[in-house]
């Protein structure tokens, strides 16, 4: 899907809430539409069953998105995998009392070096085990630019980006799905029963009809090869996630990155809990960042004031107060993953590479530890300062 369409859809979802009916999103869902309508009605009227299932409410990951600070896409994370950096960053995750991480694998890196990906991901899981952290890997990606040779290795702060996986021409042509299917089978063969996996996310944000069909086929294939680890779909909203229940999704997701108010966050949490009970399936908030009272950042308008900076404290206490699995974006302080946000100056994350934090208030709100201590440094990483400089933003915020 073109960037402009993705941004338009995201903006609609951010401003109106993920539970509103949008025909553009439901058009691809087919038979799932009736299920969506039924569950929405039950949740809206408080008709969800009182008893919640063990599967829905017994496990609550409190996690983060993890991408090393200087990796601009998943390919780079695995190509430049550094065990020392991994151990250091997992220590930061432990200090926030996290028990889970959501990470992207890379079909394109698997094509380049299958053995290296297996060895590096296995090492990552070993280190997470030592840190007491579970992992939810993402196999395919629905956001970003095309995974050309230039794009996957681009490290320029103004132009480097997340990449689609697989490429658009593969997604559009089922005759070319043999490669992704083989990759999926490879992953399931080696990791479907791995005790360190919290879940297997088959596809993140399958925007557009073609990628929806691709993701549905991959989900069905994963279900045929499933082990003990549950399957998930990275729905940007609840509509998108529910369309994959019939294909085998065990865990649903929603991505309330930039809600407009605390009331909107509370509304989201209320509905998620009600729908978990109705569906008897977990629904996790797998991407959340901060409240933005002005623009969401997905449209064409600039952000309001300092709403470009991290502010997890605006959402964390509300989320921590509810029994809902969640992952904030992101553990490491990084320029925005997607160019639409980066061009507006969006900065994400908690930790600088040296262990300083952007905001002590954020670290304390996420961890629940009001005595958390670290150096607070509200300054862009030196290697990314050309981003704020290019749009006339401050590189450092003074107390």
Identify what each model region corresponds to:
Residues 1-17, 26-29, 40:
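N-terminal secretory signal peptides
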Residues 15-16, 102, 223, 287:
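Short, cationic motifs built from Arg/Lys/His that form the positively charged side of catalytic pockets
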Residues 33-57:
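C-terminal segment of N-terminal export signals and the immediately downstream linker at the start
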Residues 54-249, 279, 322-325, 334-336, ...:
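Active-site mouth of glycoside hydrolases
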Residues 117-121, 215-216, 266-271, 305-312:
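Charged helix-capping and loop-helix junction motifs
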Residues 212, 228-297:
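Glycoside hydrolase catalytic-domain groove-lining segments
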Residues 284-294, 299-373, 380-387:
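Substrate-binding cleft of secreted/luminal carbohydrate-active enzymes
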């Amino acid at each position: 899907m073109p960037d402009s369409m993705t941004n338009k859809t995201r903006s609609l979802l951010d401003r109106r809430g993920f539970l509103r009916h949008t025909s553009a999103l439901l058009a691809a869902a087919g038979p799932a539409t009736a299920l969506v309508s039924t569950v929405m009605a039950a949740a809206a009227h408080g008709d969800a069953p009182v008893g919640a299932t063990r599967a829905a409410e017994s496990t609550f990951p409190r996690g983060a998105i993890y991408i090393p600070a200087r990796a601009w896409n998943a390919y780079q994370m695995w190509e430049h995998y550094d065990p020392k950096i991994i151990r250091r960053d997992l220590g930061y995750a432990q200090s926030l009392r996290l028990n889970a991480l959501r990470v992207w694998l890379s079909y394109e890196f698997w094509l380049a070096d299958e053995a290296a990906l297996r060895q590096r991901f296995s090492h990552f899981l070993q280190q997470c085990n030592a840190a007491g952290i579970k992992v939810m890997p993402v196999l395919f990606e629905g956001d970003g630019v095309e995974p050309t040779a230039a794009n996957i290795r681009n490290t320029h702060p103004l132009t480097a980006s997340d990449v689609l996986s697989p490429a658009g021409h593969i997604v559009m042509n089922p005759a070319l799905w043999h490669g992704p299917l083989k990759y999926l089978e490879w992953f399931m063969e080696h990791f479907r029963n791995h005790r360190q996996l919290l879940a297997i996310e088959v596809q993140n944000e399958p925007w557009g009809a073609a990628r929806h069909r691709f993701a549905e086929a991959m989900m069905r294939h994963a279900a045929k090869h499933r082990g003990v680890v549950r399957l998930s779909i990275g729905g940007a909203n609840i509509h998108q996630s529910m369309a994959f229940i019939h294909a085998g999704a065990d865990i649903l997701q929603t991505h309330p990155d930039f809600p407009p108010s605390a009331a909107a966050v509370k509304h989201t949490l209320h509905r998620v809990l009600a729908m978990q009970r109705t569906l008897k399936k977990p629904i996790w908030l797998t991407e959340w960042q901060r409240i933005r009272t002005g623009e969401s950042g997905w449209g064409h308008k600039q952000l309001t004031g300092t709403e470009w900076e991290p502010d997890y404290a605006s959402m964390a206490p509300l989320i921590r107060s509810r029994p809902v699995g969640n992952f904030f974006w992101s553990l490491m302080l990084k320029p925005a993953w997607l160019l639409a946000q980066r061009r507006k100056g969006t900065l994400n994350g908690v930790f600088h590479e040296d262990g300083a934090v952007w905001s002590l208030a954020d670290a304390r709100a996420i961890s629940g530890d009001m005595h958390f201590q670290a150096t607070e440094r509200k300054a862009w990483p030196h290697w990314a300062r050309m981003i704020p400089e290019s749009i006339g933003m401050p590189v450092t915020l003074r107390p």
